């Protein structure tokens, strides 16, 4: 071989190298030509066979003609699984020797396979495979059922007819009546259970196809977002080119838990009802005893058909798992399912594929999805529920009901240089290059698609769009500011407003995205930094810690050319943020320009539906202050501040003032609205779809005018214009959350930004509310005790769990309580190194081992209050380092929880040091607040009062009658995390020394704190005394209830957990 003149130039890159490689490979070309001829022979054989089968009018099939691969029996050890439709027995000797016209007998394909059964062999010799399948099965059923598997392995072609040409399909409207030619194909290997050998198999496939067509799109109430859809499983496709998938985002375990608990509670609530309700062959409830230990034994299902081959058995399709079940039809196992449950969201989503014309196309699409686990949603075949409100129970006008249109993900190939010559040879010393030529000509590795990059390219093109130029004096913008929020500055937002997630994948709260022509930066608080780094696509985005408005403005000034224009959505940027940004500008290097209408929405073609149902008024028994009393208090607070009116944009404040609740946001019972209050009028701006006759009548009784949500800013503008003469030195109260669109209408001169007015009105709970908070925390504590008891027992019994399963278990024990409404925040459950990220989301793949530490935080809404708690557990042998750090966190918790402090002018920041001083002495700290206020059946925090390091403000004074959390922690990066959190009520206390009024914390959360991992030597006698008193209170209250309810297993566990140290 020649050598390169330039030693730095690889030999394979020299000009003469190609000729020598060709010469080297020329004697070996027969290897490649043989493979090519074999491939052509196989394809020709399959084509001939398809023609022959069609001419014989055998039922067409959708089985893929792939050599040495048979879908259902690929795990079989029998060689017959390598037969392609029973016609190519030996792939290297020219085939089986049977032509398409020859009669094929079963024994021909199992001979020399060790069959010692003469009776079996004799019968097989007389059975023609392609013509006597029914007779085969009947003989086996009657005589040798134990040998059915052997015959099944040798009989496949009659079961799978040939593909039919469906190119004439021109409409998406489907015939939902039973069609005897209906069938399914491309089904998942685990989808069709033990039915392949049934004599009514074709009828079963027809019934399954009919069931899918008539039920799935009608119960699909998932709100599916646009863009990439991650798919857990493709179940099957039907002959009219539709397919059925299960998205990864559907929480199957939660759905199973929820339904089982609902139905179990219904049975308990209706003690006189017939235990086994009447069964109908439509929607049913299956009782599957094998899942009783998981508490998901009750399953929603759709009846598919009765099985002829199994007496009194039916085939059912589970709506929450997509599994087919063969169940004996008895009153105990199969019951009637009410429509109110049948039409809740299903796991199964009906899809079709863009551009698919025949069954070969759809098979390719499905295979691509199974390889990648994803596809791109490009549109919906939407069918709205509103016109069905009279027919459908629990209508959800915001949900997708029809079919999702998919397009597979495109793959890109990397540019690659010629491979090195050394790849032709293996490590064997005598290798002559025969063994590695295939590796030398290997196809380039597909490159992962980068949808984030594509979206940024499309977004940047909008920087100079005609609509954008209309707001920027015909100058393209150089950057776009995109806060991860909505028009009311909420941290947790629904999918409909998750524009940042659409662009970069981040699904957490808060954050600020800035897109320039060359960079994409995402700023997020320190506590969420690790979570953001794990979610955001780092190929196109840079994640940075957010510290201040000034830092962001300085970064923009540094990278942008002079006289640049920076666009933003005036509904997403708050008025206060905009004011701070203007103050931070030290030069006129760029200008902030409000561009109405978010430009991200222009490229967001498949935006999720906007969730939310009709608002609900609080029950008369709910311990809330009447609406007119709250509004009068607000008006009295406005007068001393010379305010003519108040614009309330905080959704929580609006819900609290009007005693209503909604479900537009996840975890927070609020609905999108604005409230405008003057000295004489109250006007609510809300979407008309959120109102019904009941709510309209309620607002009329409260003398509240109602207008459309989008009319808020025009109305305020008109009101200000009409009352300008009355302003003079008067102002309008707005909150810090007020967006720039509304804030600029009022202006700096006539606006008063003071959150303390609303804070003072609502931060003190009344007697009834405090009573409800105590009761709800007591119920929640009992549920957590039950979970910990069950978890400890099952771990001793050898069970293993994932983080996700345990988080679901926590919610499941809470749902048994009738007053339980839902989660107040996403449950955090993290084990081992995952717990070092304090906002970690449960991982469905992370196993919690018995020797691992784990941490959980959970909060819930109840009809009479709300809860929040956190615990860290290690039931094995913790390290000394962990025990010391756990004890320091506990010391901080005890010091703050046992502190007494003056009743007046005590700010949360002044108390924060109690929780941190023990950690500081050891050179440790944590990067989140120590505590916050807790809302009464509202947001996770109902005021701005926090216990943290941030400088105090006038609205963070702690007073009696509040509910606060205390939850210090410590996080060892990559190792573990520690957090101990309780809810506390602030109560008055008189110290005997001087009779001055002080405050202290009274615990509401009554859950044991693990003492076996405490280093007692680090605790003072006062701290030990507090811990023992706390456990005495826990056992006295929780233990009394457990004993009264005869729950002795939990009682014994609690007794051991509350032993004094």
Curated annotation (Swiss-Prot):
<dbReference type="Pfam" id="PF16188">
    <property type="entry name" value="Peptidase_M24_C"/>
</dbReference>
<dbReference type="InterPro" id="IPR036005">
    <property type="entry name" value="Creatinase/aminopeptidase-like"/>
</dbReference>
<comment type="similarity">
    <text>Belongs to the peptidase M24B family.</text>
</comment>
<keyword id="KW-0963">Cytoplasm</keyword>
<dbReference type="InterPro" id="IPR033740">
    <property type="entry name" value="Pept_M24B"/>
</dbReference>
<dbReference type="Pfam" id="PF01321">
    <property type="entry name" value="Creatinase_N"/>
</dbReference>
<dbReference type="InterPro" id="IPR032416">
    <property type="entry name" value="Peptidase_M24_C"/>
</dbReference>
<dbReference type="Pfam" id="PF16189">
    <property type="entry name" value="Creatinase_N_2"/>
</dbReference>
<comment type="subunit">
    <text>May interact with pid-2, app-1 and prmt-5.</text>
</comment>
<dbReference type="InterPro" id="IPR000994">
    <property type="entry name" value="Pept_M24"/>
</dbReference>
<dbReference type="GO" id="GO:0031047">
    <property type="term" value="P:regulatory ncRNA-mediated gene silencing"/>
</dbReference>
<dbReference type="Pfam" id="PF00557">
    <property type="entry name" value="Peptidase_M24"/>
</dbReference>
<dbReference type="InterPro" id="IPR000587">
    <property type="entry name" value="Creatinase_N"/>
</dbReference>
<comment type="function">
    <text>Together with pid-4, it is involved in gene silencing mediated by a class of 21 nucleotide PIWI-interacting RNAs (piRNAs) that possess a uracil residue at the 5'-end (also called 21U-RNAs) and guide the Piwi protein prg-1 to its DNA targets for silencing. Together with pid-4, it is required for the biogenesis of secondary and tertiary 22G-siRNAs. Specifically, promotes the production of 22G-siRNAs from the 5' end of target mRNAs.</text>
</comment>
<keyword id="KW-0943">RNA-mediated gene silencing</keyword>
<dbReference type="GO" id="GO:0070006">
    <property type="term" value="F:metalloaminopeptidase activity"/>
</dbReference>
<dbReference type="GO" id="GO:0048471">
    <property type="term" value="C:perinuclear region of cytoplasm"/>
</dbReference>
<dbReference type="GO" id="GO:0000932">
    <property type="term" value="C:P-body"/>
</dbReference>
<protein>
    <recommendedName>
        <fullName>Protein pid-5</fullName>
    </recommendedName>
</protein>
<dbReference type="InterPro" id="IPR029149">
    <property type="entry name" value="Creatin/AminoP/Spt16_N"/>
</dbReference>
<dbReference type="InterPro" id="IPR050422">
    <property type="entry name" value="X-Pro_aminopeptidase_P"/>
</dbReference>
